[in-house]
Design a protein with these regions (language model features):
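C-terminal catalytic domain of photolyase/cryptochrome flavoproteins
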Residues: 30, 42, 60-75, 79-252
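Specificity-determining recognition surfaces
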Residues: 1-70
C-alpha cells in the first residue's frame, strides 16, 4: 500500500479522538489510507499498476498477518464520495484494454463494483428495513470481549480481528468466511454482528452493512437476497490461506 503525507489536521484530530473516543477500537498510528480525493485517485492508480493483474487469481485468498494482498482497498473512498463507481469503472476498463489485463481480474473487479456494490445498494433500498429486523435462526448470543481483542482461541479468527483492529479494514473473504461465519455458527444475534461490523471498519455504512450482515453473512433474512447460507469449517479456511492446522480445527 502506498504511503500518504499526513494532513495538517492530523494531530488536532488525533487529540480529539483520544479525548472523546479513547475506548473505541482501532489504532491511530496506522493511518494507511488517504484522506482526500487526490489521495484516493492515487490509490486507485496504484492498484491498477501494481495489483490489478493478479487480482482475479488471488481475490479470495487469505494470508496470515497480511491484509491488503491484491485488493484495491478503495471501498472507504467510494462510500464517502472521494471516488465514484462510474469513474472507477471507466478508468479500470481503459487501463485493462491498454495493458492486456487478464479477463478474470477485469471481471472480478468490475463485478465487485457495479455487480455486488450496486446490488447491495438496491437491496438496502428495497428490503433494508425488513432485513434489519430479521433473525431467521433465532440466534440470541452476545459478543464477549474476546471478539473485540482477538483472544477467542481460534487462530484465523484472532488473526483477522487483530488485523481489523490495526487497519480498520480487511477484505471480503475474512469478513464473510471467517469472522461473520464463526459468529453465525456460534449463534450470535445478527444485530450484535451488525453492530460489530459497523464499529470496526472504515468503510462501514448502514446501507452497506445491513444487506451484507443480515443477508449475505448470516442468512438472517431467510433468503431475501441469497439462496443459501454461507457457512464453512476449517477445511475451507485451510484451502484458501496459509493458516496452519491446529487445535482450532477441532472446534471449527
Amino acid at each position: 500500500m502506498i504511503g500518504f503525507k499526513k494532513s495538517k489536521y492530523d494531530e488536532e484530530i488525533k487529540k480529539l479522538i483520544i479525548n472523546n473516543f479513547d475506548d473505541h477500537p482501532g489504532d491511530l498510528e496506522n493511518t494507511w489510507f488517504p484522506v482526500n480525493r487526490v489521495g484516493a485517485e492515487k490509490q486507485l492508480d496504484n492498484f491498477l499498476k501494481v495489483r490489478f493483474e493478479n487480482f482475479g487469481i488471488y481475490e479470495d485468498a487469505m494470508l496470515e498477518k497480511k491484509n491488503f494482498l491484491f485488493h484495491s482497498c478503495i471501498s472507504p473512498f467510494l462510500n464517502i464520495g472521494f471516488l465514484t463507481p462510474d469513474k472507477v469503472i471507466k478508468k479500470t476498463l481503459q487501463y485493462a484494454e491498454k495493458n492486456n489485463v487478464p479477463m478474470n481480474s477485469v471481471e472480478g473487479f468490475v463485478r465487485q463494483v457495479i455487480g455486488w456494490r450496486e446490488f447491495i445498494r438496491g437491496i438496502y433500498h428495497e428490503e433494508g428495513a425488513l432485513q434489519s429486523k430479521s433473525n431467521y435462526w433465532k440466534h440470541s448470543k452476545k459478543l464477549t470481549s474476546s471478539w473485540y481483542d482477538g483472544t477467542t482461541g481460534i487462530d484465523p479468527l484472532d488473526d483477522c480481528i487483530k488485523t481489523t483492529l490495526k487497519d480498520g479494514y480487511i477484505h471480503h473473504i475474512p469478513r464473510l468466511m471467517v469472522i461473520s461465519n464463526i459468529m453465525n455458527l456460534c449463534g450470535v444475534d445478527p444485530k450484535e454482528i451488525y453492530k460489530w461490523f459497523m464499529e470496526m471498519y472504515i468503510d462501514s455504512s448502514d446501507w452497506v452493512m445491513v444487506p451484507n450482515v443480515f443477508g449475505m453473512a448470516t442468512y438472517a433474512d431467510g433468503g431475501m437476497m441469497s439462496t443459501k447460507p454461507y457457512t464453512c469449517g476449517s477445511n475451507y479456511i485451510l484451502k484458501m490461506s496459509n493458516y496452519k492446522k491446529g487445535d482450532w480445527c477441532d472446534i471449527l
